Structures are given as C-alpha cells and as structure tokens.
Amino acid sequence: MIGTFNETKLAVTQKTSHSEVRLPTVCVAILNWRGIKYLPSLLSSLLSAVNKYPGECPIVVLDNNEGDDTDRTWIRQNFPTVRVIQAPANDYLYSYNWLLQQLTEQIVILLNNDLKVDENFLLPLVKHFTNPRVFAASSRSYDWEGKQVTSGPYLFRQHRGWFYCTPDLAKQFTCHTLFACGGHMAVDREKFLDIGGFDRLFYPAYGEDIDLGFRAWQKDWISVYEPESIVYHAQSGSWNEDTSDRKAEYMTLRSNFLFQWRNLDRFPFAWLHAVYLPWLRLRKLLDGDRVWLKAYGEAKAIWQQHLISNSNVNFKDRHLSKDLKRICGTKF
C-alpha cells in the first residue's frame, strides 16, 4: 500500500492583497554554467516580469564557470542592468549557500539557467512571504513549448519501506508541498541560512531541495506550490549534454537513500525500510539492476562517513508523523 495523507483545509498564507501589506524586498538569482544557449530567453523574459512587478527586483547571475568569462562578458554587453557575480568555485547549486550570505534582500528567487518565465511570474510567489511562516514557494512549470504541465505539489509517499515523492499534476491550485523545486523557487533568505542552506550530503545534485524543504517543515515553516507563477523549463538543459537518463536515475536513487536515512529515522518509516530493504536488495541483485545497486552502495558509503563526521547531531526532538501529516497538498 502507498502511504499518503488525508487532506484537510489549511490556510497556506494570509488572504490579503499586495496593496494592503508591504511586500518584502526581493531579488532573482540565476545559477549559470555555460548557459549561453538559454540565457537570452531567460533574461529577456525575466526583465519583462521585473517591469510588471510593483516593486524593485534586481537580477543577479551567479556564474559557476571559473576559467571562461564568455558568459559573463556576453551578459554585461547585452543586459547591462543584470549584476554578474563569479562564484568562488564551481560548486554546483551549493554556490547558492555562499551567494545568499552576500545578498541582503529578504526573499531570493533561485532559478536555473534553462528556463524562461511568464511576465506575471514574480508577484504570485512573493506575496506568500507576507506570512512569516512561509519558508519557500515554487512555481508551476511547463515544458519549453508550454504544452504540458510538468509540476505540482510534491507529496510524501512510502511504499514497502521505500521513500519517494512525485508531483501531483492534478492539483493545480495554491497548496502545501513537501518542498519547493530548487530550479525555480523563492525562499526566505534568513530562514534558508538559519537551517544551513543546501546540505552537501547530497552533493553534487538531486535531493537537496527535498531535504531542505523537509528540514524547514521540522521548524514549522511551510512550503507552497503556486500555479499562478509560471516558468517554462528545458528539461536538464542546465546539465552537460552527456548526462544520461541512467546517470540521472542513479543520482536520484542515491539521494533517496540518503534522504530516508537522514530524515526518516522514526517509527514507522525506519521500521518499514529496515524490513523491506533486504528483500528489495535481493530482488535487484536477481534482476541485475546495476544502477540501483551502485546507488545503494555509494549512498551507504556516503552515509557511513556522514555519521562519523556528524556524531554529535541530535534529532531526538522531531515528531515525524505530526510534521508529515501537514505536507499533503491541501487546497488554499
């Protein structure tokens, strides 16, 4: 059986118009690595969105390309109002952890470079942060052509001891979500830094945004799915062209193991995982599923090292069932 949560009506944020409250300060931060293919579309559409936004919203490009200034030069020549910052090193999206320490805005909207945005993209996200409990808000995404919705609120699920989460594409209304998608999310900067930003346990990628959202829920901070804010995504466009589906599957599986071992260490989640994992591993051995077996082996090694390095961390005060019941895609 797949474990889900019963829906109860919960207020995601305060029902006030932006004219009645003072919006927080905001900026957009774009993570870039050799993104010249998509940057023209993203920056052009983003400038249109900024022009429609009822407040100030500077744009920052965080360039992860250390040795080549081609993108930085092109941006400065073609979009002079966009601020370009070179990251200290190519640290994948963990460069955000460094950047948000440098910025001063209350809300930072994190974007991959393989997007373009709707002109009304900004306000539906930012308005949620008039509620002090909101940690993050995520946009609705379409494919690049705008034909197919590819996002929804993420719901927690566990099937025979295996954690996974998938977007519920049918729920296209403002609601809670397990996490805000790291490729297009607005986040409260101080809260982000308070919980340590993206955890390097998941380096280089996949799963870090799930873990971030889950840790925020542990602090009683909510994440919101906001379909009125729209982006268009070129799937995996920000990765190397040689990043295969099998590699993406492997990285996702590895991160799922790490997330479960890090966060779901209470009954019944840990118990179900411990019971079913030997059976699942045997089945994968018999099937010859090398991707799964490799992901499990590497995740186990990473986790053992993590336990050694973080032996003083105490999670005894968490109440997982209570927290997870709130993460259920409830209607606003």
Which residues does each predicted region cover?
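A short, conserved alpha-helix in the catalytic core of glycosyltransferases
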Residues: L178-G196, L201-I230
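Glycine-rich, basic loop-to-helix element that forms the pyrophosphate-binding segment
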Residues: Q86-L103
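Acidic donor-binding segment of Leloir-type glycosyltransferases
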Residues: L46-Q86
